[in-house]
Amino acid sequence: MNNMDGSENNAKVSDSAYSNSCSNSQSRRSHSSKSTHSGSNSSGSSGYGGQPSTSSSSNDLSDQKKEKELKKKKQVETLMPDTQIEVECRPEEDVINIPSEEGGAADDVLVPSPKQTLQTDNDIADIEVAIPDTNNDKEEAIVYNTSLINPGTACPFGRPALSNCNGFSCVISMHDGVVLYATASLTSTLGFPKDMWVGRSFIDFVHPRDRNTFASQITNELAIPKIVSLTEETDQTMENPGSTMVCRIRRYRGLSCGFSVKNTTTAYLPFLLKFKFKNVNEDKGNVIYLVIQAVPFFSAFKTSNEVLAKTVSFVIRHSADGNLEYIDAESVPYLGYLPQDITNRDALLLYHPGDLGYLQEIYGSLVKEGNVTRSKTYRMMTQNGHYMKVETEWSAFINPWSKKLEFVTGKHYIIEGPANPDVFQNPENVLKLTEEQKNQAKMYRDSIIRIMKDVLTKPAEIAKQQMSKRCQDLAHFMEMLIEEQPKPVDDLRLEIQDADHSYYERDSVILGGISPHHEYDSKSSTETPLSYNQLNYNDNLQRYFNSHQSNAFVDNNLLPSRNPLYLSAPHFSESIKNVPSAMEYSGDVIDLTGPGETSGVIVFNKSPTMGLKTGKPIRLTESSLTKHNAEMEKELMKIHREHRCYSKGDRVKVSNEARQKKKEHLARCNAGFQTISAANNTPSVYEKPHNLKRSSKQMESEPIANKHHCPSSRQFRRKQTTCSGGFAQPPSATNPVSTSSQWSSSPVNNVNPFILGVRMQPPMPILSPLPVVSGMFPMYYTPVTATVTTSEGRPSEPNYHRNNMNNNQFQQPLGNSRLPTTICVIQCGTSRIIHSFRGTRTTGGTRYT
């Protein structure tokens, strides 16, 4: 034993601040620090445990102490016969004894077996705890996988100082919050020996301001626990990341800090805690343990005003009123603030007062634009009171319903460190401001908050502009659909009966039913284009009112006796030339072949799109007709688009002109009706045929009298009872005929019922179809007998129509016998061809709609 003089250099006293609190917790430990130490002295009145020492006092005192220690040893062995702690002392190293008091209870908490302790703590040279194998059953009940709680080898945050950057790990019972196990790195990190933590409540070492946060974090984790059973054979390290939090843990004070308890400030070190819950199966049932891995935080700056080689960023989010809502845990080594300390504080207080003017402009642009790419360098305050320089990328979240700014998020890039590199030091009043500067800074902060709360954001303005534009587009669309209707004029009334939908497809009346949408170019994306049928119907009505039908009188006596298709009459050829443009671009081919007759082909070779310039006849097929219809639809849609491009004034002008034309046309029709009524009293040799299609253009060379076969006298037309072309019977000189009976009962009406929408008469019964020719559509014919009498009262030859086709003349001798007249209708798609026959020869014209 050495002298007492050297004992101060080789011994340390345990933390005196815990001398009283340790007595309560030590009583619950499975082992007692009151056990006699071999070769050591203890003092029960000092409040500290006895410390093994190499020095000794007089021989008398040592003998008395040995006797007392023997008595105490016997007492402890009777109280705790199952547990004994032996502490081996090394003279060259500082050995710390654990304070305790008498009367400790035994077997309250189980500790790990000595084998595992020696395996995981081989690097500890200070203290070795040995427990005799007196109760192997209880020791084997709890087996810890220490590989799960060993700290990492890298220090993720900041730079290591004098402490160990790897941190430490500990196991806590969730039953009473007592530390059951701690790694040996606890001593190098905080200065505490690991046995000082065992049996103590973990929350006693946590900073008072962080205890509520720690308790709430544990409670939240237990509400939805992530438990991995140790009895499972799977890897225990996967699929259980746990949760993290930042808190401050008390550091150990030794003799170097002095013996004064009241005048000494308690030091705390910030740690990043990672939680994991373990479910251990015991004899009493499942017990939940909490495994905590603590990694210390150190200041990220080493020198004053340090410029980091690698730019580091962290995120801060605050609300529109400046209240800080979130801060990254990665910001702790750079700012020094713990998230729970800075949350719910004014985020604008972090900015330097001299930079608030610039930040006011930044916030003004932020609420208008929605984001700011990257600001200039400005200053932000750290925990120690100094300022570091940062650059920030800003973004704002706008509530889509209220159009108000909800919160602002800033991603801050550190450019330069503060003047004091230790950001965890106590704050210093570095910046001293005058009252005027303080008032100005407060004014800037209030202005920034007012900007975030009151200024209307740009996304809201854009939304209003878009809504206004949509309303304008909708109004324009409605104006285009609902054009100004003409004023009601009694003379322009037109009674149109409901169309019989059995004669055409019902889908054609649907809006846009067969419209070529890909060919329709509309300014408004929401507008539904009109269908071709509707446009064609309107165009037919317009052409009906604007057209003046030109007719030719045919003298039956001038016809050769054997030429039913005599086409040399000049007035008839002129009327054929005045066929509407739709007829000129038809390109239809009709093949009419009778039994025992040569094939007769009628070709309308005027279509520029059908490639018929060679003059070769092409049969009327479905593909050619479909192609022709597509071209006509495109032309009609093009005309419709051109008319829509007119301004409102142009449309009004065109509407007025159309009404004026209708009035003039009606007047001419009425005048023509009066002329025809007067002419009925005089016998006439010629009569107008009714199976020719009217011309859409007025012929300059024809007299006015030939232009008034317009069915504008609606009362007269409604008295007609036929619906297909026929031959008129001229009035006799000896037997005059009234106006109501001057037409024969069999002729066909020359007005297209599909144009006027008039209901057609029921079709006549079909007698027999013609033989179907390859490449042709089936045709059906019905016999119609037309009797024509001359002025002498004897039957005369029928009145045949003349047609001029490629300057070819066909002649057929006329017989005195009465031949039946056949009407043939060919329809495909939107085209319809009507022919009348006498026998097997064609005797009629062509009708196209």
Curated annotation (Swiss-Prot):
SUPFAM superfamilies cross-referenced by the UniProt entry: PYP-like sensor domain (PAS domain) (SSF55785)
UniProt PTM comment: Phosphorylated with a circadian rhythmicity.
GO cellular component term of the entry, any: nucleus
Family matches, as CDD domains: PAS (cd00130)
Region Disordered: start-end pairs: 1-79, 680-746
Biased segments, Polar residues type: 1-13
Coiled coil: none
Highest taxon of source: Eukaryota
Sequence motif Nuclear localization signal, residues: 63-74
UniProt feature, compositional bias: Low complexity: 14-27, 35-58, 735-746
Places the protein is found: Nucleus
InterPro entries linked to this entry: PAS, PAS-like_dom_sf, PAS_fold, Period_circadian_regulator
Protein role: Involved in the generation of biological rhythms. The biological cycle depends on the rhythmic formation and nuclear localization of the tim-per complex. Light induces the degradation of tim, which promotes elimination of per. Nuclear activity of the heterodimer coordinatively regulates per and tim transcription negative feedback loop. Behaves as a negative element in circadian transcriptional loop. Does not appear to bind DNA, suggesting indirect transcriptional inhibition. Expression exhibits prominent circadian variation in adult heads and in particular in the photoreceptor nuclei.
Name under which the protein is recorded: Period circadian protein
Species classification: Eukaryota, Metazoa, Ecdysozoa, Arthropoda, Hexapoda
Gene: per
